[in-house]
């Protein structure tokens, strides 16, 4: 609509009907990460997630293991993951501070910018195993740098190209996800699907809507509720069996 409207107004300017095109100043709203009916199946169940993480472990690449582990066990966005610096991770308190993200600028170059919304800036907790995997990767990263001769930066990102120490290209995770799934004939989802997966499993494990919204940094409760509705629909199918087991003598 904006494109066609702008074309008409451009013509009006050319014909000197109006002085300027007001559509030039109209900003399109950012797309929201709602879960639609078309991608309800684009996530992993608890068992599928376990199976996928095992396939990642079989790659014998601690960097990939760390990256997919963090995605699966925190629900952070791909850009937030790839923008992480070691200083953002508090290994004493097992927390990660999300305060930036990677994006493409108008010149198609990878840049660091503030997260997509105010609520996206947040501290999230991580479990001991995730923390230990990250510690292992941190040591391994330094070993790779030392072997190649790469200098460590003052604000060292957690995940970079080991040779150039530059940020990974934005499609890095999707490319490896696709490769691993194809190699093992395994169900393929998109990287953003790990966010839906984490959200769904949080609800299934008993966390409240507010807790999940805060952890995932959803600015719009509608996004959280769309996944919650999907999970409760699944749980409703099991209500009879669960109640029967509860009442069993």
Explain the meaning of each model-derived region.
Residues 1-3, 14, 18, 23-84, ...:
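Basic, Lys/Arg- and aromatic-enriched nucleic-acid-binding interface segment
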Residues 6-9, 13, 232, 236:
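C-terminal flanking helix
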Residues 14, 69, 73-80, 171-183, ...:
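C-terminal catalytic core of tyrosine-transesterase DNA break-rejoin enzymes
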Residues 35, 102-104, 216-241:
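Catalytic-site neighborhood detector that most strongly recognizes the C-terminal catalytic loop/helix
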Residues 36-41, 57-59, 111-121, 160-169, ...:
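Short, contiguous acidic/charged loop-to-helix segments that flank catalytic cores in large enzymes
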Residues 45-50, 127-186:
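Active-site/catalytic core of tyrosine-dependent DNA strand-transfer enzymes
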Residues 93, 106-121, 125-132, 136, ...:
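C-terminal secondary-structure termini that scaffold catalytic or DNA-interacting sites
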């Amino acid at each position: 609509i904006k494109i066609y409207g702008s074309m008409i107004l451009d013509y009006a300017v050319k014909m000197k009907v109006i002085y300027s095109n007001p559509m030039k100043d109209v900003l399109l709203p950012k797309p929201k990460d709602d879960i639609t009916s078309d991608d309800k199946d684009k996530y992993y169940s608890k068992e599928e997630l376990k199976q996928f993480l095992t396939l990642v472990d079989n790659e014998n690449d601690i960097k990939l293991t760390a990256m997919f582990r963090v995605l699966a066990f925190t629900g952070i966005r791909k850009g937030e993951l790839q923008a992480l610096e070691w200083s953002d991770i508090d290994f004493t308190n097992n927390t990660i501070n999300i305060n930036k993200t990677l994006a493409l600028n108008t010149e198609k170059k990878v840049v660091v910018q503030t997260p997509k919304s105010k609520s996206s800036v947040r501290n999230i907790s991580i479990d001991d195993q995730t923390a230990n995997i990250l510690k292992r990767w941190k040591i391994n990263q330094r070993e790779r740098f030392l072997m190649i001769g790469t200098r460590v930066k003052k604000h060292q990102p957690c995940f970079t190209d080991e040779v150039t120490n530059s940020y990974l290209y934005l499609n890095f995770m999707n490319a490896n996800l696709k490769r691993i799934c194809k190699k093992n004939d395994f169900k393929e989802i998109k990287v953003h699907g790990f966010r839906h997966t984490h959200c769904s499993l949080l609800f299934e494990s008993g966390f409240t809507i507010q807790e999940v919204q805060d952890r995932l940094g959803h600015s719009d409760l509608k996004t959280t509720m769309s996944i919650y509705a999907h999970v409760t629909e699944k749980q409703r199918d099991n209500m009879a069996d669960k109640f029967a087991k509860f009442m069993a003598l």
